[in-house]
Amino acid sequence: MQILCHLSQLIEKSAEVYGEKIALSYRDYDREQWMGISWNLFARRVDQSARSLVALGIGVQDNVAVFSQNKPESLFVEFGSFRNRAVIVPFYATTAGAQVQYMVNDANIRVIFVGEQQQYDTTWSVMSLCHSLEHIVIFDPKVKRHPSDNISMSFDEFLRLGINEPRYQAEVQRRVNDAQGTDIANILYTSGTTGQSKGVILLHSQYNHALEAHTKILKITPDDVVINFLPFSHVFEGAWAKLCLSCGAQLAINLRPLDIQRSMREVQPTCMSAVPRFWEKVYQGVLEKMESGSAIQRNLIKDALKVGAEMWEKYTSKGKQAPLGLRLKYAAYDKTLLRVLRKTLGLTRPNIFPVAGATISPEVERFVHAAGFPMVAGYGLTETCATVSFDHPDKPVSLGSIGRPLPGVEVKIAGEDNEILV
């Protein structure tokens, strides 16, 4: 069941349905284990964040920056901001100081949330040049602050600002009640063809349409475990995360990109969005593994992938039934060699694997499907709240295609350059 509502109410309404079910999980690097956050706790942290933002003087449609790696706190702040009708402006965790300075001043940001030492140091280095910036809130308690820093606070200190203040809670509820689809949800800075980055405005109504339209095609359920690999600051991952949360799925938040393969084996996700480069590395790793094996092993794996590719490209992707001999051969490989391959990657329960952001080569796309990963290739823009088109699992799919338009989206190919108009 998908919960469709203004994003200011999504986590609250989801907690009413799912309660103590795990909504978010993350690796605790001190304990070396994955920790869970229930929907109830998620909703409490969102509400605490909303009240504390009021305490800091954040008003309706004020801009709040999040400069961090993927963390649960990023989502607490984002949805807490939505409850205030405030706007989240996410920065990539690797953003340089000059760009941070530009975006803070351009968006008139008063509060910035930083993830770890690198983001804190970068922000502090340009603090004197950011004339609107009043507060730095630090997610990681291990961050060492500058000796002269008297404006930053830890995330725990931030959360305590709104405790036992009924007036803050009343103000948050008033803003939730007044929330409109025309409210700005995000400003996403993207590199322009010339000059400084441009801030793309996304409205709550755009998200609401996108979330509803996707679930007409994709089947995401509360049983899904979705690992977050791409940064939330990217429209692809940010919109995908909101879609999965609206369907009650669990988000397994991967902090460090280099840990992704380890995280996949530990979490055993059913879904993950990625760029083609991720699958290219997986494919290259399989090829290298094949070359290090015996001739018999190489030939068996090659044949398994060949059979899997034929099964998908000629039959499954076209909605056709394969000949009995091919079906039996594929079933044998699927239960043995291909199953081992999926287990090695930590993807034994595959459901949906969206891929976008660049062109994926036919060779890699063929491999992904041959191995049994239901990849959904697509195309999108920041301005369109990510998706323009993607492969519809219930419709015929062609190798190299970027699928069919999202319901409600109109596309036109125009001019001598075959420009895509949306």
Residue ranges, per PLM feature:
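Structural core segment of the AMP-binding/adenylate-forming
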Residues: 10, 56, 83-161
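Conserved pre-ATP/AMP-binding loop-to-beta segment of ANL
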Residues: 19-22, 138, 153, 160-189, ...
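Conserved AMP-binding/adenylate-forming core of the ANL superfamily
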Residues: 24-79, 96-101, 154-159, 204-205
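Conserved AMP-binding A3 loop
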Residues: 36-40, 177, 185-211
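Conserved structural elements of the adenylate-forming
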Residues: 43-48, 200-221, 229, 339
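Conserved ATP-dependent adenylate/AMP-binding module captured primarily in the ANL superfamily
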Residues: 95-128, 210-227, 257-271, 344
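Conserved AMP-binding/adenylation subdomain of ANL enzymes
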Residues: 208-225, 232-335, 349
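Conserved AMP-binding/adenylate-forming
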Residues: 329, 333-422
